[in-house]
Amino acid sequence: MITPETRPADSGDDPSTLARALEPVLIEACQGKLSDIEWFHADWQRGGAATGHAKWTENGNACPVIIKLPVGGIELSWTARLGDHGLDRDVRVGQTPHPTPRVFHSGAELGEYDLGWLVLESLEGKAVAGDLSASSVKGLIRAAAEFHARSIASRPDLGSPPATRDWAGIFARSRVSVKENRIPDSQRWNEAIRVVQKALPRMLARWEARPINTWCHGDLHPGNALHMPGDDGHPDRCVLIDLALIHAGHWVEDAVYLEHLFWGHQDRLFGIKPFSMLRKERKARGLDVGEQDTELANIKRVLLAAAVPRFIGVEGDQKYVAAALEKIETLMGQLSHL
């Protein structure tokens, strides 16, 4: 969230202290185009990043910017790679919005530190998480499709996906959690997980044979996108932020991840189906879609659903947990051919 609600940075906050100490070096690295920086702490921030407001002046034109440091290698590389485009504020109706922020400058070092940093266009939007509507959800999914298109165009060599998670271990702990946490419908849960465990080798064999056809965002949730409503000739649009978990994979991973966040609360999707809409948006952009997509999505849904008891208390509520159980019971029948 590039321009969220903020509070002044606490003087004892280590990232901000380091950022202030490095501010003169950062301004010098930007060749005098960056103004003095007002450091702040954003409500959405996780981890040890410092963030600041400033202005970037070039050819007599000043633009509000956000400075972020330190930035990890994956986020730095991809944000810079995809941020070489025009300003969001210049996008007009009829044009395709940029899926990620404009990057004015970036680097992997600052002074004597190996420390990644970014200077980004400041966006006047709200996080989709705090602005849920049909238009913001659609904008998020369109931005994901455009991200898929631009990322594969900029780096066609996908390489290998991350190693498969230890699903067998996760599901074993899920069964223990069902008992220890006295999860409602415990007998149904135990039976559902048992069925998944029995089919797991076949499901994983199918999953691991999936086509690797995109760079997945990896963390596609409403807190990682800004929504800018359309006005004054600008289109309604969303911009994705936090590109730290990008990885090679199959596009259904992003779709199902977003979808599963709303299990038990589908009303907050306003009738929008993330899998169906993302598939449609990818197809419209000439990106790979296939007949196996639904089956792969169902496998991913089952894997996530059977893991829910393992992470009880970390995410979800009773409606979410109940919906996850229903997913397993419904989808395992559809996957019985595996």
Locations of regions flagged by a protein language model:
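Conserved short submotifs of the Hanks-type protein kinase catalytic core
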Residues: 113-126
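Active-site ExK catalytic segment of metal-dependent nucleases
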Residues: 64-73, 121, 242-244
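Active-site activation/catalytic loop segments of kinase-like enzymes and analogous catalytic loops
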Residues: 252-287, 301-330
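A cross-family kinase active-site recognition segment
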Residues: 101, 105-107, 130-191, 211-213, ...
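Active-site acidic catalytic loop and adjacent metal/ATP-binding pocket
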Residues: 45-56, 61, 201-253
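A conserved alpha-helical element in kinase catalytic cores
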Residues: 66-115, 130-143
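Conserved hydrophobic "DFG−1" position in protein kinase catalytic cores
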Residues: 53-56, 69, 105, 122, ...
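Juxta-kinase regulatory segment immediately upstream of eukaryotic protein kinase catalytic domains
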Residues: 1-41
